[in-house]
């Protein structure tokens, strides 16, 4: 360091090597800057107005700078002033030295990356990066070692070879893809422009306590599923279902009313009938549930004697008699069908069984028929079939039927009502005794039963018997005795002479049911369909067989023919009734018997199913005439073949299409000229074809636009151009042949027109000058024009020459 004194100035000079020293001494402060001493003296003696005059001083300092030399005292003052005013910080010596070092380091931070192929033999691309930054992620690494560590750790898909700076080159890095990376593919983050890749921020791992994994400490519980006896659970009494548990019997309330009891039931039982769930009687272990009975007789009462070992329930019967009949039941497991007695006197019922509860009886006046006309039609519209279940004990009958008061609710309900009976308990619903108008009752009840949307499927298990009602109309009935085991006696409905009117309304609706009635019988069960017996006198029927069903008999009067003419046609149109029988089960189909006196029927077969017999009156022929044709009608319409339809449609459309085309005028897509119908219907493609006539017109119009050309010259150019186009003269070797043929084609015109011949000679001279024709060709063309037409010969081009006929070149002036 040397100190020099200049006139009026005192400066300190420091070499460049002193800039690298870390300790900044006052004697070593140099920056090549020269200022007058007066300036620095003013800086040494600060005044109060220095802060306000900083800008003025800076201007004076900048004006008085000679070279980059400043005295040491100046930098001291600048450093002290920079504490109060940051503006002087950049002018201090320490700041300038750091900036110089930074600039020097930046100048040496350049490094070159050579991107080479996989075999590391050839350089594909070279790139120079400053500040030792990464070329892939643009992160400044601060030095050669930092860059080396960063590349090896963050971009391990590539292979790097580092070279230190030498005399001939600076630091370099050879980059190549590893062979292992090619097998699995190159990472997308390491390829492409890193500036376009999104920036992802990863925060530091927070020191949080790990949640304890209590999965190993959880006690494993062994789940034990225990079976529950649902029969022992208490149940409610929804929808008036009886509740029976442990020999306790609860019966529905009795309704003893006056003559206007019909008004009561019309409001109460209808609401019961609209329940959302159907009633399903459930019987277990010798329990019996019997529906109500409707007894209607005229003069005398009827006594029912039941002498069975176990519980017996008798379903209702409908009898309209002048004289009553005693029914004796001396069998095991026999259910007596329901009875409807209309009489002036009451009926006594004798039950000699164990655990039998008598159902409440509803004894109404003559208007009881009106009651049932409003209540029982609700039976008909069940959304689900009636399901009846039985136990394995014998002697359980009549558990299929429910009271007339409860059956309406069964019909419209969507789910069954469950009658639950345990341990030889009996729940019997009330009985309804109506008057002489029982026929009016059936006219409204049975049709509704037939209109059910789904079949009634009684399910019988283990030697249980279900019997459906019968309709018997007679004036005098004899006693019926049954001495058979496991034989059902179907219910009898004995009505007056108006039974025919009843069936005219009931059985047709049975036929209109949407689905067949399917009866499912298991284990020696017998299902019998209803019978309609109408006669004046009925004889006794004896059954001495085991497990033999008696088919239903229809014994009608003279009006039976009229009944069946209305009923059986509807049966024929509906779906068939399919009785399902399993394990020695017998299903009997209905019979129609019409006679004044019926004979006794003896059946002595085992497990036999008798076909239906039809014994009709004189009008039976009318019945079959209406029923059998209905059976032959198919349920589905005939469908015409689609292929045949298409063929017919195509044939019809073809004729229509041709007629429409004939009435239209078509034009060419290129020439815009009208086309004939034959041209339109031809298979030729007119889309890409060239119309010579249109091209000739366009060529003529093009030549007419020329100015300073005579008509003869235009005429000659027009003929030559269309000749070359039509004869496809496209090569130099074609020109000699074209000249000869053109002379032959227009020989006569050239002889008549001297100007035309002149232009033809001038054109041949141009062709000869250009070397397209030789002297021999030129001579041939001249001899063709001088020779006669016969000697010249015909046109040998092979194409029609009519297109080159003489055409007028007259132009409208």
Swiss-Prot record:
Residues 15-26 have a biased composition (Acidic residues). Its main location: nucleus. Weakly expressed. Expressed in late siliques. Polycomb group (PcG) protein. PcG proteins act by forming multiprotein complexes, which are required to maintain the transcriptionally repressive state of homeotic genes throughout development. PcG proteins are not required to initiate repression, but to maintain it during later stages of development. They probably act via the methylation of histones, rendering chromatin heritably changed in its expressibility. Required to prevent the proliferation of the central cell by repressing unknown target genes before fertilization. Regulates the anteroposterior organization of the endosperm. Residues 1-27, 197-216, 232-261, 274-648 are annotated as: Disordered. GO terms for cellular component: nucleus. A zinc finger (C2H2-type) spans 134-155. Transmembrane segments: none annotated. GO terms for molecular function: zinc ion binding. Residues 243-542 are annotated as: 12 X approximate repeat A. This is Polycomb group protein FERTILIZATION-INDEPENDENT SEED 2. Residues 501-512 have a biased composition (Polar residues). Residues 232-246, 296-307, 319-331, 344-353, 414-423, 453-462, 514-523, 574-586 have a biased composition (Basic and acidic residues). Residues 648-783 are annotated as: VEFS-box. Keywords: Developmental protein, Metal-binding, Nucleus, Repeat, Repressor, Transcription, Transcription regulation, Zinc, Zinc-finger. B- repeats lie at residues 265-281, 372-388, 403-419, 442-458, 503-519, 564-579, 624-640. It comes from the Eukaryota. Pfam families: VEFS-Box, Zn_SUZ12. Belongs to the VEFS (VRN2-EMF2-FIS2-SU(Z)12) family. Residues 388-402, 472-481, 593-602 have a biased composition (Basic residues). Probably indirectly associated with FIE and/or MEA. In plants, PcG complexes are probably composed of a member of the EZ family (CLF or MEA), FIE, and a member of the VEFS family (FIS2, VRN2 or EMF2). The gene is FIS2. It is found in: Nucleus. The keyword Chaperone does not apply. A- repeats lie at residues 243-264, 282-304, 305-327, 328-349, 350-371, 420-441, 459-481, 482-502, 520-542, 543-563, 580-601, 602-623. It comes from Arabidopsis thaliana (Mouse-ear cress). Residues 265-640 are annotated as: 7 X approximate repeat B.
């Amino acid at each position: 360091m040397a100190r020099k004194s200049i006139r009026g100035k005192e400066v300190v000079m420091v070499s460049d090597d002193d800039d690298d020293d870390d300790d900044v001494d006052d004697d070593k402060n140099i920056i090549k800057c020269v200022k007058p001493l007066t300036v620095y003296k003013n800086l040494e003696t600060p005044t109060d107005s220095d802060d306000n005059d900083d800008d003025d001083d800076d201007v004076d300092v900048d004006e008085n700078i000679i070279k980059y030399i400043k005295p040491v005292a100046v930098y001291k003052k600048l450093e002290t002033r920079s504490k109060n005013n940051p503006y002087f910080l950049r002018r201090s010596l320490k700041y300038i030295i750091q900036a110089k070092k930074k600039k020097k380091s930046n100048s040496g931070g350049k490094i070159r990356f050579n991107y080479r192929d996989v075999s590391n033999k050839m350089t594909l691309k070279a790139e120079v990066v400053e500040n030792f930054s990464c070329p892939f992620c643009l992160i400044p690494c601060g030095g050669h070692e930092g860059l080396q560590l960063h590349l090896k750790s963050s971009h391990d898909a590539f292979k790097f070879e580092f070279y230190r700076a030498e005399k001939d080159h600076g630091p370099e890095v050879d980059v190549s893809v590893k062979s292992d990376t090619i097998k699995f593919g190159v990472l997308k983050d390491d390829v492409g422009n890193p500036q376009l890749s999104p920036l992802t921020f990863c925060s530091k791992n927070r020191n949080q306590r790990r949640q304890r994994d209590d999965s190993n400490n959880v006690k494993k519980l062994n789940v034990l599923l225990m079976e529950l006896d649902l029969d022992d659970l208490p149940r409610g009494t929804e929808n008036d279902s009886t509740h029976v548990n442990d020999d306790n019997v609860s019966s529905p309330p009795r309704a003893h009313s006056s003559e206007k009891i019909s008004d009561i039931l019309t409001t109460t039982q209808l609401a019961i009938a609209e329940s959302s769930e159907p009633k399903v009687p459930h019987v277990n272990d010798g329990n019996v549930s019997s529906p109500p009975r409707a007894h209607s007789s005229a003069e005398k009462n009827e006594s029912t004697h039941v002498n069975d070992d176990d519980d017996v329930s008798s379903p209702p019967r409908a009898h309209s008699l002048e004289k009553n009949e005693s029914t004796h039941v001396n069998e095991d497991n026999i259910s007596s069908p329901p009875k409807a007695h209309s009489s002036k006197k009451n009926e006594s019922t004798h039950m000699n069984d164990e655990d039998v509860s008598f159902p409440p009886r509803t004894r109404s006046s003559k208007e009881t028929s009106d009651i049932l006309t409003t209540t029982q039609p609700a039976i008909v519209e069940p959304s689900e079939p009636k399901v009846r279940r039985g136990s394995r004990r014998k002697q359980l009958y009549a558990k299929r039927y429910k009271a007339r008061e409860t059956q309406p609710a069964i019909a419209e309900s969507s789910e069954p009502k469950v009658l639950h009976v345990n341990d030889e308990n009996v729940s019997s619903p009330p009985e309804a005794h109506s008057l002489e108008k029982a026929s009016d009752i059936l006219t409204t009840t049975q049709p509704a039963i037939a209109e059910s949307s789904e079949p009634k499927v009684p399910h019988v298990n283990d030697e249980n018997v279900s019997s459906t009602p019968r309709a018997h109309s007679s004036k005098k009935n004899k006693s019926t005795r049954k001495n058979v085991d496991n034989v059902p006696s179907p219910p009898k409905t004995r009505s007056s002479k108006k039974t025919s009117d009843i069936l005219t309304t009931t059985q047709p609706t049975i036929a209109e049911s949407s689905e067949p009635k399917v009866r499912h019988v298991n284990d020696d069960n017998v299902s019998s369909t209803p019978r309609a017996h109408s006669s004046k006198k009925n004889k006794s029927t004896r059954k001495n067989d085991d497990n033999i069903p008696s088919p239903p008999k229809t014994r009608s009067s003279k009006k039976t023919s009229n009944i069946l003419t209305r009923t059986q046609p509807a049966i024929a149109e509906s779906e068939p009734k399919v009785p399902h029988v399993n394990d020695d089960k017998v299903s009997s189909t209905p019979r129609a018997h019409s006679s004044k006196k019926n004979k006794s029927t003896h059946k002595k077969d085992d497990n036999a199913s008798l076909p239906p017999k039809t014994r009709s009156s004189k009008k039976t022929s009318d019945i079959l005439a209406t029923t059998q044709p209905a059976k032959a009608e198919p349920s589905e319409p005939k469908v015409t073949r689609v292929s045949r339809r298409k063929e017919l449609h195509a044939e019809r459309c073809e004729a229509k299409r041709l007629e429409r085309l004939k009435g239209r005028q078509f034009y060419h897509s290129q020439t815009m000229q009208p086309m004939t119908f034959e041209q339109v219907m031809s298979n030729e493609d007119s889309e890409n074809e060239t119309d010579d006539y249109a091209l000739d017109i366009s060529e003529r119009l093009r030549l007419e636009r020329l100015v300073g050309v005579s008509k003869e010259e235009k005429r000659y150019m027009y003929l030559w151009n269309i000749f070359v186009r039509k004869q496809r003269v496209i090569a130099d070797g074609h020109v000699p042949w074209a000249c000869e043929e053109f002379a032959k084609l227009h020989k006569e015109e050239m002889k008549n027109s001297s100007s035309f011949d002149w232009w033809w000679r001038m054109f041949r001279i141009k062709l000869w000058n250009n070397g397209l024709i030789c002297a021999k060709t030129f001579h041939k063309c001249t001899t063709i024009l001088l020779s006669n037409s016969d000697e010249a010969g015909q046109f040998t081009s092979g194409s029609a020459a009519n297109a080159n006929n003489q055409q007028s070149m007259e132009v409208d002036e």
